[in-house]
């Protein structure tokens, strides 16, 4: 089994952990409906950039058919 030659310094430990920080996800408000959603994602109503992309009623009818 591999064993390190010498102990890692706090500086090296910090540099290794520098990419582990948690970041809050950025939320946006839709222009048409005012619904809150993740950036670059479609809303639950089917809107993206203020335009209707997906019609839920048609999708439900396709699934049930």
Curated annotation (Swiss-Prot):
Keyword match Hydrolase: no
A GO term for molecular function: structural constituent of ribosome
Domain of life, per lineage: Bacteria
Pfam families in alphabetical order: Ribosomal_L32p
Residue spans of biased composition, Basic residues class: 1-19
Region named Disordered: 1-32
GO biological process: translation
Keyword Phosphoprotein in record: no
InterPro entries for the chain: Ribosomal_bL32, Ribosomal_bL32_bact, Ribosomal_zn-bd
Alphabetized UniProt keyword annotations: Ribonucleoprotein, Ribosomal protein
A GO CC term assigned to this protein in UniProt: large ribosomal subunit
Family: Belongs to the bacterial ribosomal protein bL32 family.
HAMAP family tied to this protein: Ribosomal_bL32
Protein name: Large ribosomal subunit protein bL32
Source species of the chain: Vesicomyosocius okutanii subsp. Calyptogena okutanii (strain HA)
């Amino acid at each position: 089994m591999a064993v390190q030659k010498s102990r890692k310094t706090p500086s090296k430990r910090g540099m290794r952990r520098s990419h582990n920080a948690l970041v809050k996800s950025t939320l946006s408000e839709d222009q048409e409906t005012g619904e809150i959603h993740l950036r670059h994602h479609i809303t639950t109503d089917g809107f993206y950039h203020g335009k209707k992309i997906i019609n839920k009623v048609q999708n439900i009818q396709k699934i049930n058919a």
